[in-house]
């Protein structure tokens, strides 16, 4: 059979021991494509397959996806996406896609049925304090575990937080972190990850803001704290503190601008929480930020019950240092 191009992936295509059922939309600047597939034989359990990009910089993309598998094999937490076997080889969790030109690497994951936090937030605007804190505490405890295991996620954002089960009104939400593609400490040929949620130290290490190497200096876990501060801000206010028309303008704001107080847009928030986010999470200097453990300790004080409000239309000595 003649190999096909990665861009020609479609339902019905064969990939390893799987038949593709659905091709998910390609993410902006992504290093891989993701499809939903069914095994050709054996158990009838579906898997999400992540396939490395080909073409320019493909050696980097191939290495990154293999590193992602290695990281996920070392993590065992309900808040981290679970691997699924794709081959009977030495490492059953990764395989070459010989059906595709250049035989890119791919690996399998559980299918997460509830969509992304980004999709859930559309149309909701801001969440209540108890709900926002519950979201961030659940994701934060997952990140605290990841940090203990010696890794930093480096791309925490609503698009990379999915829900394990299909969303039903009144049920509790179970967020799961996906996409560990930039968790590996590799030299980056381009700006991987979402700039809006990116910490300043990850932007400063390049002479050109549009092409940073993205190697976090000092304690890389502090970049995740920054992203959680941005996420909490978004959940409470309905928008991120640093926005712009281009990645370059967002980069400039992250590096130079002081984030506006959340209380300017929402007066019912506790002043100490506003100070915690602005000074404890979004400090420009990583060493001035709290640890993920401190973040979780503070956020847990505000956390409440978090249940689905609506099913999505498209299925597709600072005061906190105690």
For the regions a protein language model found, what residue spans apply to each?
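Activation segment signature within eukaryotic-like protein kinase domains
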Residues: 135-136
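Conserved short submotifs of the Hanks-type protein kinase catalytic core
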Residues: 98-116
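Structural helix C-cap motif within protein kinase domains
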Residues: 237-241
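AlphaC helix of the protein kinase catalytic domain
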Residues: 116-127
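Conserved C-terminal C-lobe helix
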Residues: 268-282
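Protein kinase catalytic-loop region centered on the HRD/HxD motif
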Residues: 141-151
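AlphaC helix of the eukaryotic protein kinase fold
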Residues: 56-74
